[in-house]
Amino acid sequence: MTERLKGYFMSIALTLCSALLATAVTALPAGAHTGGSAAAWEVKAPPGSSPTAVVALDPADGHPTLTVRRAGEQVIAPSPLGLVTEQADLSKGLELTGRTTRTVTERYTSTTGKSRERVARMTEARFRFRTTEGARLDLLVRVARDGVAYRYVLPRGTGNVLREASAFTLPTDSQAVVNAYRADNELPFKRYESVATAPAGPYSMQALFNTPGGYALIAESDLNGSYAGAHLTHEANSPTYKVSLWNDEPIAVQGSLKTPWRTIVTGDLTTVTESTLVDDLAPPSKVRDTSWIKPGPALWTWLAGGKEAGQSLTAQKKYVDYAAERKWPYEVVDAGWYYKPGEWDVIDPDWRTNSWMPELVRYAAAKGVGVQVWLHYTLLTDPVEREKWLSTLASWGVKGVKIDFMDSESQERMRWYEEALEATARHHLLVNFHGSTIPKGMQRTWPQVMTMEGVGGEEKRNNTAEQLAALPFTRNVIGSMDFTPGAFHRPFRPNVASDAGELGLTVLYESGIQNLAGTPESYEARPEARGYLEQLPARWEETRLLTGDPGRAAVLARRAADGRWFIGGTFAGAAHTADVPLRLGAGRWLVETVTDGSAGLVRGTQVAKGGATIAVPVVADGGFAALACRWHPGRTTCEN
């Protein structure tokens, strides 16, 4: 045989081997198991650490399921997958046609949140399914150190999505910390000792469960205008929480579709609390130049001054003066500023020429304070009007907008969010959404989003000490949360007997713009609190859970760029001495605490080694604030 013929046959052989190998990898994927007669495939986190996702296909009716395991125990029991469109039922009758796996590594810098520099490492598996009629469904599964997520990918021509079959079945001996769903996401969290005993009804996609395999926070990520927001639906005495779309309305699909990530943040309580998985799954920033995006504390005037302040230039200048004295970078003007003088909720048709806002912005800028302003979202629904409002505000020098009362997670409203975010980014305006959805990865994709409400904050009267201690493990894991702490003058606080607890919330709750809701007079009456608030940094480099029990206790430490650790704690229950471990690093630390005394706030200091436990006195339903810095002989304060 000539060398030429040998080469020809060798080429054919290599081609055939490659084809056979590809078939083996996709149609008969490695890692398949046979539990009974079902086939199952594992997806593990790099580099093989927990958790593990198991995708299974029932051969009897072809319905897919997902199981999540960690440390040899179930976190999520076998739970249904799939969805139904106008053209096909993609929740059963499926067969696997292929599978591929890749490693995803992404590095990014966050302008807000628990940490600044982030690295996301995930294993991604793509499962290709089809029905006997030929309809196709791809399932993407990602597994990371801190969780599991999946999404559906549909080709063109599949039709509108009618519903999802997605659900999460918890082990029956799990506990739940959940809040009933409402469009503004503001209802309080409640703790149930069994997942099945939670009342029937809808629950938010920020549900925390304590399972035999660890904690699991169910959420979603990468929600945009191609889909609608989802919530969980629970039937009485059931361990299953089903995914329901907004008002059960069909999802309009044009072309192909990627659904949001159905996300399970899982691990021990520390892992879940410190997780950035919801952001990690979201698309990278759409804002190339982020140099203008500057977070930081703000003096918010609504709870301090109400309607009168919103319509008074004199009052707003007073707040600007106080923010400047405290070196807080922002002051927020709430509702009323564009209304007719002396009238409420009536827009001045000549607001652009009559408004005192340009004068306030100039006044504030001269003192080093940026002004942010409130807007009702309906002013920004029409593209022409949106451009008029935002361009005018930007030309005046306004630094940000607080947009309110969307109160919907419909597909149409999610499209509006994208339009508003594109416009605010173009005009270099920071954003705070109120009456809104929750972040769901939005802050990575649109880094000008400093914070969002989606929580029953300081202005509500139905908060409890248990609610305060649940939020760090639920809502605030998802993203920045505008609780607006620091309202010492409010008589309706659940921690009204604990000014130290109120102070601690300013650190315990992360928000890119930490809107401080107190009056200048209330801060002046509490010099220990005022001095602490003056030290708050613009952003956090790192976050660590020191101790906690969802709904009962939470103590978090957040590191500033200068190496100091700010610590906030809140507790539900009787007065006691809290044992707080210092997970701050080796060496000796000077810890300054602010606690409640019989005559007001008390400031104390102690020196402790990293890893040691300090004792902090806490009043009933109270808390504390602290500041820790490296100790050296002669150092007596952590203040700069």
Can you annotate each of these PLM segments?
Residues D549-A586, F624-L627:
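Carbohydrate-binding surface patches
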Residues A335-S498:
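Aromatic- and carboxylate-enriched substrate-binding clefts and catalytic-loop regions
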Residues Q254-Y330:
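An acidic-aromatic substrate-binding cleft motif
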Residues R69, A575-A599:
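Beta-strand-rich binding/interaction modules
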Residues G36-D280, G600:
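N-terminal accessory beta-strand-rich subdomains and adjacent acidic, glycine-rich linkers
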Residues Q606-N640:
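C-terminal beta-strand-rich structural cap/linker in extracellular carbohydrate-active enzymes
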Residues A500, G504-L546:
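Catalytic cores of secreted or luminal carbohydrate-active enzymes
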Residues M1-H33:
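Secretory targeting and sorting signals
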